[in-house]
A protein has these predicted regions:
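NUDIX/MutT-family hydrolases
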Residues: 174-206
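N-terminal leader/linker segments that precede catalytic domains of diphosphate-processing enzymes
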Residues: 1-111, 118-132, 140-172, 197, ...
Length: 212
């Protein structure tokens, strides 16, 4: 658990995989885009290393890279990409917001996870990113600033995730979109019975109803 927000340290240059050729990456990327036109090769941050700073926080060293190096892992092409993302646990009146991933997404289709979440973009502060993701995915605003509580590694998708505790007044469930096909607000006992949680959600589960 974090006692202070993580610090991102940007390393100059651009991450390019060494273990595979760019021709292999381009061919795999073209195959993915043919299957799902929603794929977009945007800028991402590659994690070079994560270390504790001795003050209840962590330093995350990052370098700019491209999303295609992450995406092609779905076809078994490991570029060594390790992106950094943000995840939020939204609490509203003693319940937390979860969503079921649609079949159109690249990772965890059909699995339940905490909403919101997304990949951190270069130049964007992590707390601003999680607020943006919440606005995009739930079309709602936060009622208090995000609080960073943990940094996790999602082994299923090889990504580092900064986890935030979020507060919002969720009076009605968000409308579904292309990323999620169902939303729920669940109490602790209900969350325990939810099957098909994503790997990252299972790691976040003990944090969900812990004391803030």
């Amino acid at each position: 658990m974090l006692r202070r927000p993580p610090v991102l340290v940007k390393v100059e240059g651009r991450f390019v995989p060494q273990r595979v050729t760019l021709e292999e990456v381009d061919a795999a990327w073209a195959s993915l885009c043919a299957r799902n036109p929603r794929y977009f090769d945007g800028p991402v941050l590659q994690v070079l290393g994560v270390s504790r700073n001795g003050h209840g926080g962590v330093q995350i060293h990052v370098q700019e890279s491209s999303y295609r190096f992450i995406a092609v892992s779905a076809l078994g092409l490991d570029c060594g990409a390790r992106p950094v993302g943000v995840k939020g646990i939204v609490e509203s009146d003693g319940r937390v917001l979860i969503g079921r991933r649609s079949r159109s997404v690249a990772h965890y289709p059909g699995a339940w996870e905490f909403v919101p979440g997304g990949t951190l973009e270069p130049g964007e502060a992590p707390d601003a990113a999680i607020a943006r993701e919440f606005a995009e995915e739930a079309r709602l605003a936060l009622s208090a600033p995000p609080v960073a509580v943990a940094v996790l590694f999602d082994t299923a998708v090889s990504s580092w995730e900064i986890v935030y505790r979020l507060a919002a007044d969720v009076r009605e469930l968000p409308e579904v979109g292309w990323e999620y096909d169902e939303f729920r607000l669940v109490a602790p006992e209900e969350l325990a019975g939810v099957r098909d949680l994503s790997g990252c959600a299972r790691q976040m589960k003990p944090i969900a109803f812990a004391s803030a």
